[in-house]
Curated annotation (Swiss-Prot):
This is Transmembrane protein 78. The keyword Protein biosynthesis does not apply. Its main location: membrane. It comes from Homo sapiens (Human). The chain crosses the membrane at residues 49-68, 78-100. PANTHER family: PRIMATE-EXPANDED PROTEIN FAMILY (PTHR12138), PROTEIN-SERINE_THREONINE PHOSPHATASE (PTHR12138:SF154). It is found in: Membrane. Keywords: Membrane, Transmembrane, Transmembrane helix.
Amino acid sequence: MWLDTRNLGIVISCWKGVCVPQTTTLEMFYNDNDRVEESSNSYQIRREFLLPACLPAFLSFSTSFSFFLSFLPLSLSLFLPFFPSFFLSLSLSPSFLPSFLRQGLALSPRLECDGAIMIHCSLNIPGSSDPPTSAS
């Protein structure tokens, strides 16, 4: 399936949990757990994923992702001494990143009370003239 992350300008093709950037042909794949709503040339897909029981309830995508990226400025500054690590650490700080992810990405997972992650995404067929509808 094609995911149009409009704010980043990236088109991603996902098949069985593996996502790679794509720019050519359109292929739509979805499984029985997906709910697809079609309107003219856009699709709204809602998918549920079960979380493993061993994960703590407070662990969410934005927390783990920002924790991972908080080590990025240090590792880059070790390999690139001339790189402006202050600017990079400011832009990738954990306090800035979760709010950026919530506002900037079209693909936004969130932790539900029943232990499922709901992913709302907007699919836009390449070459269509109408603007894509936004996921709510």
